[in-house]
Amino acid sequence: AHIAPDLLQHLIKTYRPTFYYIPHDVPEETKKILPMNKTVTAIADSLLLQSDTKGPELFQDLALLLTTSGSTGSPKLVRLTYRNICENARSIAEYLHITDKERPITMLPMSYSYGMSIINSHALMGATIILSGHDILTAAFWERVKRENVSSLVGIPNTYQIFSRLRLTEMELPALKTLTQAGGKLPYELHKKFGEWSLNTGRRFFVMYGQTEAAPRMAYLPPDKTMEKCGSMGIAIPGGELKLIDEAGAEITAPDTVGELVYRGQNVAMGYAECAADLAKDDEWHGTLHTGDMAKRDSDGYFFIVGRKKRFIKVFGNRVNLDDTERLLSAAFPDAGFACVGQDDILCVYTTLKTEEQHRAISEYLAQTTRLPAKVFHVFFIEAIPKNPAGKTLYSQLEIR
């Protein structure tokens, strides 16, 4: 993965690695950071380097450390075991019905848990994985898709926005049989568009839900339910369990009642690492993950995400969902970008719309929609909404003012 020099330096200081796997053309500023002593071997277009640093003690089952999509710029890592990774790969292969005839193409970095899971689940079943370094906006990528008879495409919500602009639904791709989506909630209209197209053309469209802390998959929406349950994250993956709990930790059994989503399964990581000593720790989570997502379950057992637990604020005693506020604004002003942050009685809206008139229109619209005073909505212009490589908004970069 491409890592900023200051973060790389911090990671090296924190975790004291003995080996480094780096590209041949690593920037000079990065070379100065790496404590390189000798080259162990060259692999494709990369080098495996060894330093004299004595590495930290490792827990016997620790297999992999991955950054979470929400911790860009942070040394906090997820501690995954071999069992976590293998169990999740098996489960994904089961519900996607992956066989050795599948031909996926790499579209996401392997350092991203979604990208890793695609490789692992297909490799487990002996499928052929097409390696591509081309951006999906290039003609070279789509030529490769056609030439290699690629059978599945994957993407985060932003990818599907690009698919829509590129008119994927009008392309001649006879070998394409499966689409999968994860990495954030897909806007309802895109879910509907690709769901209808897949059903009408005999393809399968899987909307999925996961977090790096679960290696990463926890739920999927069966393709035959894609329209009936449009907007849903689906049901638990094979071998996993999902439930909702209230603020007191009691399980919620009534349908259409919002609570925190809790997952249990063998793919749940051992915990986080924030320093070298954490790498020697045993399993702290014991197969249970409190996702931090607020959701509801319908009477048929299908789950729907409504927002992040930390993305709710109180405004004059009313509970306001910041994620819902963003969705309302995106629907009302479809050509603009929005990000909402806030604290009690203050809701800040960052938008790519520039004029004061547009900002007044935003405040008035929210006041009418939420029945809250317009003065609680503070609207600010921003050139672009800050996003991480997974396409998720970096709220930590937005000031509450």
Where are these regions (language model features)?
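AMP-binding/adenylate-forming catalytic core of the ANL superfamily
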Residues: 265, 270-271, 292-374
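Conserved ATP/PPi-binding loop(s) of AMP-dependent carboxylate-activating enzymes
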Residues: 235-239, 250-282, 320
